[in-house]
Amino acid sequence: MSKIASEVVATTLNDWYIAIKKQKVDESIKYYSEIKKLFDEMEEDQEVLAYYSLLEERHKMLLHSSRGEPLQKHTYFTEDNQNFITKTNDKLEYNFYLFEAMYEAYNKNYDRAINLYGLAEKKLAEIPDEIEAAEFYSKVSYLYTLVKQSIVAQHYIKNAISIYKRHPDYKCKLATSTMIAAANYADMKRFEEAEQYYLEAIDIAKETKDEFLKAQLFHNLSIVYSDWNKPDKCIESLEKAIGNESWLHSIYYINSLFMMIKELFKIDEKMKAINFYNKAQERLILMENKVYEAKISILYNLYCGELKNNFNNCISNIEFLKQQNELESVDELSYIAAKRFESIGAFEEATSFFNAKIWAEQKMNQVEGIL
């Protein structure tokens, strides 16, 4: 039986990558299943195998971001593979750096991610493809968003949005890019604009009939309402996210439970908050998440029991979040804790949390200096 030409498989890989870039999750899953079978019959070609391995990693990241599946440890981003990739072509080398940067950003290794995005950008200049440019802009913007560099992030994401608007097949990407723009407006305290962008993204998600994306957007919109001090709207948005079946089964469900607990405690709905706290404990047994376990424990100990007696538990969980490089969580929860202890006259304890908040701010500013 004759072997399948590697060029034929490479063409199918290109189609797979287009599906990934369009954020077409079901199509990507279909290609992944079909392409694996082709390799048994393909003539040997190391470059095509490398391309497949890169897309496999990118596919995993798509399932994580767009369906809330756990992200497995990468298997391809090694020094040996990098050395091989640099001897191939600009597109493969660009993808290697881009995908590894995304993975490092996910792991909060921001210095490494920044360096890799810089390498990717140099290779991008050799690739005349505006969709590829939009993909790059959106990923870099997301990194800037994570470290609260909102103005720079907006510059990149507006470029991505402009490109995606010219390509109707990329509506899911347009929605997620609009979501990033909304998040940056929220970080700048421009809440009306943030709300407007989120609602626009939700409308786009409805057009695509992507229920998971819609739930994700409602969850993120709830964060805007929380920061805007609109608890009723925050809770309403969270209910829409939590009520979504695909969101319920994803790793992101615990994020919404955390938000609900925080908001209910904030408005003194203690019994309702404890009810969601119990749901969170059940979920954490099924899906371990040490970061959210610590975050939820902090909230519970700030609002339940004798506050002064809960200091050690709260501060130890803050220290754990610091070790995990959860800068935004340390910043937010340290401030809540500081104000709670300050309200009962426990100024020494409050100072410990204010210092933790300052630490987080300084760390984020260090990242800004690198950027």
UniProtKB/Swiss-Prot annotation:
The UniProt entry, under Pfam families, shows: RapH_N, TPR_12
The activity regulation comment is: Inhibited by PhrK, which prevents RapK-ComA interaction.
GO CC list: cytoplasm
Q: Which GO terms describe its biological process?
A: establishment of competence for transformation
Q: Give yes or no: UniProt keyword Cytoplasm.
A: yes
**Principal place where this protein is found?**
cytoplasm
For this protein, the record's InterPro entries field holds: TPR-like_helical_dom_sf
Q: Which UniProt keywords apply?
A: Competence, Cytoplasm, Repeat, TPR repeat
UniProt entry tagged with the keyword GTP-binding:
no
Compartmental location: Cytoplasm
Intervals holding TPR repeats:
7-42, 93-130, 175-208, 215-248, 254-290, 331-364
Knockout consequence?
Answer: Deletion of the gene has no detectable effect on expression of the srfA operon.
Report the protein's function. Answer: Involved in the regulation of genetic competence development. Inhibits the activity of ComA, a transcriptional factor that regulates the development of genetic competence. Likely affects the activity of additional regulators, in particular Spo0A.
Would you identify the family this protein belongs to, as annotated? Belongs to the Rap family.
Quote the protein name from its UniProt record: Regulatory protein RapK
